[in-house]
């Protein structure tokens, strides 16, 4: 039996690590969840994701409720108060329980002398809630995005930025990919129905299913046997443009955690696939996914800027480059991105993408296909990136995705309930 822990203090410390230390919630949360009971795992996740999703609102409220900010060793208390405010605003937890558990969190973070302060701030919010929220809703903080990102979205999408922001602030649906080597989508949907769950097929992507209600993966029919994989619908769109064929040599570059590698092998089981990623730790997830689905691929650690180091002079029939990016298209799924990214990251990422494109292009066979993909919505990483590449690369031709003036296909967050995603299909003349 697992020791009873204070979930509010755990959530506060996790959020602090994201915001103050730049750590990814994807790395922080799983080890914390191992320390709590199964019934508490979901609440811990809800508190962490929820606070990060609404961080700018909670920060704004604390600045109004407190005379001066908590600093130094007391900074964790700032995030503990955020957790308390989030519960009062967005959860069905009874207010008295939310207050009591949050105040007790002060003991867990070794600040028992501040219990009175935490209690006082939260009770003050309860008294002034209506007035404070009216003022908040008249401020730019209501968009729940950092100002630098808001400015970029407003510039890139003058007519659509508000709908993008709204989609980013929603909870994401759970999308699945049915393994067509085991089941047709319709036959797996019938199994899902028998298991008491409901799913909906995507109109454009032939393997994609959206669950009516998110569910644990172990509850999904055949998950352990590789019948189905969790993957957003927009990410599945890569296969529409890549169109892998049996017998081809295909490179999946920047492949971790392996969702697209295994999708290639589902579509073309006899393809020779090489999966490469710079992050050796994340490659372990590629191996895990291949094993669960009973598939084989050549997996290598390598830097996309220096392909000769890991593939020599080898050329490929098709290349999928899922380029490192700002991930601004998947904020609803990873709200910590809003606070991990900085404005200065964008030109640096664009430069890295450009270097990888230039380095990998010679490894594409004449007549071959390269699909450039990102989970970003920023033009500097997407249409402008491809436009510049086409201008400097004489034997590259845009195919099926956009025009030379506006290259690529941009999915915006929430469109057809998918994530924000960009694709450009290039052919080597």
Curated annotation (Swiss-Prot):
It is an enzyme of class 2 (transferase). The active site is at 375 (nucleophile). Keywords: Cytoplasm, Methyltransferase, RNA-binding, rRNA processing, S-adenosyl-L-methionine, Transferase. The keyword RNA-binding applies. GO terms for biological process: regulation of DNA-templated transcription; rRNA base methylation. Specifically methylates the cytosine at position 967 (m5C967) of 16S rRNA. Its EC number is 2.1.1.176. This is Ribosomal RNA small subunit methyltransferase B. S-adenosyl-L-methionine binds at residues 254-260, 277, 303, 322. Its main location: cytoplasm. It holds the Pfam family RsmF-B_ferredox. One of its GO terms (cellular component) is cytosol. It is found in: Cytoplasm. GO terms for molecular function: RNA binding; rRNA (cytosine-C5-)-methyltransferase activity.
């Amino acid at each position: 039996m697992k020791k009873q822990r204070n979930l509010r203090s755990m959530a506060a410390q996790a959020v602090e690590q994201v915001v103050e230390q730049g750590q990814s919630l994807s790395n922080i949360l799983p080890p914390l969840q191992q320390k709590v009971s199964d019934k508490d795992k979901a609440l811990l996740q809800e508190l962490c994701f929820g606070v990060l999703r609404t961080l700018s609102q909670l920060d704004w409220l604390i600045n109004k409720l407190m005379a001066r900010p908590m600093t130094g060793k007391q900074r964790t208390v700032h995030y503990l108060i955020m957790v308390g405010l989030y519960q009062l605003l967005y959860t069905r937890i009874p207010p008295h329980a939310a207050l009591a558990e949050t105040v007790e969190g002060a003991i867990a973070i070794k600040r028992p002398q501040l219990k009175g302060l935490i209690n006082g701030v939260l009770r003050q919010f309860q008294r002034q809630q209506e007035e404070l929220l009216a003022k908040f809703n008249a401020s730019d903080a209501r968009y729940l995005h950092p100002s630098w990102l808001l400015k970029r979205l407003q510039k890139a999408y003058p007519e659509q930025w508000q709908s993008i922001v709204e989609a980013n602030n929603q909870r994401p649906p759970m999308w699945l990919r049915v393994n067509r080597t085991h089941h047709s989508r319709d036959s797996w949907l019938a199994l899902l129905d028998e298991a008491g769950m409901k799913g909906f097929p995507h109109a454009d992507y032939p393997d994609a299913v959206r669950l009516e209600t998110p569910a644990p993966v172990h509850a999904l029919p055949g998950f352990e046997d590789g019948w189905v994989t969790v993957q957003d619908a927009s990410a599945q769109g890569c296969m529409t443009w890549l169109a892998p064929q049996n017998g081809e040599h295909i490179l999946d570059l920047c492949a971790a955690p392996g969702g697209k590698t295994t999708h290639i092998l589902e579509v073309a089981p006899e393809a020779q696939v090489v999966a490469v990623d710079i992050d050796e730790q994340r490659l372990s997830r590629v191996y895990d996914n291949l094993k669960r689905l009973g598939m084989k691929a050549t997996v290598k650690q390598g830097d996309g800027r220096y392909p000769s180091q890991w593939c020599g002079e080898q050329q490929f029939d098709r290349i999928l480059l899922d380029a490192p990016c700002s991930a601004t298209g998947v904020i609803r799924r990873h709200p910590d991105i809003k606070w991990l990214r900085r404005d200065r990251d964008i030109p640096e990422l664009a430069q890295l993408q450009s270097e990888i494109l230039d380095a990998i292009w010679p490894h594409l066979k004449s007549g071959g296909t390269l699909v450039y993909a990102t989970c970003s919505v920023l033009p500097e990483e997407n249409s402008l990136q491809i436009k510049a590449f086409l201008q400097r690369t004489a034997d590259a031709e845009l195919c099926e995705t956009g025009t030379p003036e506006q290259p690529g296909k941009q999915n915006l967050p929430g469109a057809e309930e998918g994530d924000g995603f960009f694709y450009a299909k290039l052919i080597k003349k």
